[in-house]
């Protein structure tokens, strides 16, 4: 990492010194959140907590008519099940909607085995589905959740009746431009050390701003939630453990083996998973349709939920 970048990070400590409690926070990092308080704030009904066979306690919501067609949502990095709120509000009228907090995210918290490879996430997804007794379903994944959904579909094609990927990671990145600074820092041991010690609500806000095209769409509620879950005990350390490893991109051969009908939704202005990554998926998947949304960044389901719903409904109608 260039020394100028590290210097800029160090200087940013001055702007958050008061918020983080000064020298103590620089040494130890931000205060940890209160689990009971966070559960009271974010875990009210229809939330439930289930225990998987691997011992993980998963925060989950299962809404809509139990007899309706099921649709399962898998959120992205540093998100949680609430990221789907705008889509779920309308989908519960026609679907059984399942969403949950991945390991090290939201109210699920760190995993008992402290492992954060893609195989662990896929295993959790599989166990959640089995726990709920679902045979086949539509699978929707965003960003990292899209990558997890792709990997799950590779191993369980008969269970996924349709696959919807929003700004999914896992494709090769060809742009000469770099990902946002926060992601670059996470790949560097010194960067992770610094982030832990200068992390603040303002930095949580900046992380959200990187995910959208129009930053005015970011609400205080969204910022508070990212901040709250980032200081959930153990979540940040688990994130650093995950970023210390490298998740390999998919190769064309394994992607071409997915015959499931797939919808790709991408923001034209996505700087985290650029449009070219969606085009790569579209070129490799044998039964894919790609929609590119202008003036939208990395979080189309948050930035333009109505447009996403229109695209999903229209596409699903072609499968009937």
Regions found by a protein language model. Name each.
Residues 1-71, 94-95, 135, 316-320:
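Alpha/beta-hydrolase fold catalytic core
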Residues 29, 174-179, 196-257:
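Conserved alpha/beta-hydrolase catalytic His-Asp/Glu region
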Residues 53, 61-63, 102-144, 310:
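Active-site loop/oxyanion-hole signature of alpha/beta-hydrolase fold enzymes
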Residues 56, 63-107:
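Conserved HGGG/HGGXW glycine-rich cap/lid loop of the alpha/beta-hydrolase fold
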Residues 154, 163-192:
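Flexible "cap/lid" loop of the alpha/beta hydrolase fold
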Residues 258, 264-266:
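Short beta-strand/loop motif that positions the catalytic acidic residue
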Residues 269-273:
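Acidic catalytic loop of the alpha/beta-hydrolase fold
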Residues 288-320:
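Catalytic active-site module of serine/aspartate enzymes centered on a nucleophile-bearing elbow/loop
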